[in-house]
């Protein structure tokens, strides 16, 4: 009798173990199927996507220097981004991605500054020194970006990517005006030149901007459908927008832009 009961308990244990194994395999298969459902559209793991989005951001010193006392206005000059990415999934959850993106982006700001080193034009005169007053700046850039990123799938529908990028600028604009203040020529104690709103001084440093910029891109994608996705990304520039020998603005300005849009997966 004891032998029979022992065999019966053993059979129950084996049966329970088989049930657990079957359920585990089923769950794993379902999870794999979900990744396949939202994954690359080819068995090889290769795929590509088209992106279109809105760009918002600007160029900024990091950290904000003491010469900039307050920012009165900030208006992003709503830009666009259009691009194509090619990716290769090396595993169902991670892979690599590279792309070519066109962008047009800019901003307009109005700030209160003190002892802000500037080179300005008033009438036919060029003046350089330290300005205190209101500064209005406009920037705009167009070009192409080549990102190279690692891609990780958090879940079947969510993925994040990060990596370096290299940008080439086709068009560069950096101009503005100063008023409601004064300029000390040469240094903070030099001759004082008053500049009022009715006769502002202007500047244009567009030709002093670099053609090549590099930085880091961080982004996230969410699959809304088999082929359609929503994305958001941040491009953080690592080198300043001006040439290294440009000294009129005596601190570096870095491009910092966010992008949101839609993508179509092939």
Regions picked out by a protein language model, each given a short descriptive name:
Residues 50-56, 98-104, 162-168, 232-236, ...:
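Transmembrane beta-barrel strands of outer-membrane/channel proteins
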Residues 88-92, 152-156, 224-226, 266:
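Outer-membrane beta-barrel strand-turn architecture
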Residues 93-96, 157-160, 226-232:
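Repeated loop/turn-to-beta-strand initiation elements of outer-membrane beta-barrel proteins
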